[in-house]
Amino acid sequence: VGYMPNYESLWAVATAINKGYFEEQGLDIKLTSFQVDEAGIGLMASGSVDVAYIGADVHNRCIEGAAQIFCSSLKVSGETADCQSWGCLPGYVEANKDILVRFTKALYKAMDYGSQEANYDEVAGYVADICGADKATELEQAKEGNWIDSKTLLQYLGDGTLKKYNESQQKNFIDAGDVDKKVPIED
């Protein structure tokens, strides 16, 4: 599992590891850190990791087909949402659907736990331990956003909110010249 050493990338994975949610799903997780958003896709392409965190800045590569999103996550702040995801190479989904379903179940259970403000301190400690960072700094990052749970994410998927966020993100990439043309969000 490729991740960036920050709260946004790690909060759900760190929680799933420390609470035993991956283990419940029969998954043995090995973490690989990367420093630049684009590097996660490179790690997958090289075979170093099967899945990687894909931050909002690199979703343009998913639009271009370099990676496929299998699990979404949002950080909501006021009127905006950062669309973050867990992705894999396009062919990995078909060959490893069972693994991805179990990974997603563990992440969603971790999101349900870690999105509760009462648990921010604990989750910040998990992230700090993995990153070798200061817990207080990670806790500040936790307080910067509204981390959603799986129920809210599924509601956003069902009512079209997630699609609207992704369409807005795609439009921003097109307007900035980072993506040439619009593609169906469902892809």
Regions found by a protein language model. Give the residues of each.
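Short, glycine-/small- and polar/acidic-enriched structural segments
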Residues: 1-81
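A bilobed periplasmic-binding-protein/Venus flytrap-type ligand-binding module shared by bacterial periplasmic
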Residues: 15-16, 82-97
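Conserved aromatic
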Residues: 34-35, 93, 117
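A glycine-rich, aromatic-flanked flexible loop/lid motif
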Residues: 78-83, 141-143
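Secondary-structure end/capping motifs
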Residues: 96-180
